[in-house]
C-alpha cells in the first residue's frame, strides 16, 4: 500500500470506529436486572459465550484451572414462578482444555475422564429454590464418568435483554458448585490433587 494513502486511511478509520461504537451503544436496549421481568419461554445455551471452568488444589501449591467449551443445554424461564424453572447443561468431555497439552490429553484418557467411553458431563435440574431476588439454589443430578449423583448449583442472575449483535433475547447466569470427583470414579492422585473440584458455569441462554 502507498504510504501516502495509508496514513490518511488509518486516520479516517480511527475517527470512524469510535463513532460506530457510539451508534451501537445508543441503539443497545437496556439490560433487565429484575428476573421477574425476563420474557418467559425456553432458551438455548449460546456456546460461544458460555464457559465451564473448573479448579483443583494442585499438590498444596497452587489452584489449577481448566475449562470446557462447546456447551449445550436449555433453560425454561417462568418469571412469576421461579420454582417452576428448569435447566439442563451438557458438556463435551473431549472439550477439556488446560495450559498443558500433556495434561489436557491425560484428562481425556481412560484413567481420568475417559472421554471415549463417557463423552458428556450432564446436569439436569430437579428443583429451583430462590435464595434472594437474583439468586437461587438449583438442585439436580450430575452424570459424569458413567455415575449419576445429586448436585446443587448456586445460581446468580446477571441480566437479560436483546443482544444487539444477533437480535436474540438473551439471559445470563453464573452457576457455582463443588464436585467430589472420587464419587464419580475419578480418584487419580487424590489427595495430592484435591478430591473437591470447584465448578463455575458462566452461561448465556438465547431464544
Set out the residue ranges of the language-model regions.
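Sec-dependent bacterial lipoprotein signal peptides
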Residues: 1-20
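Low-complexity, acidic/polar, glycine-enriched regions of mature
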Residues: 20-207
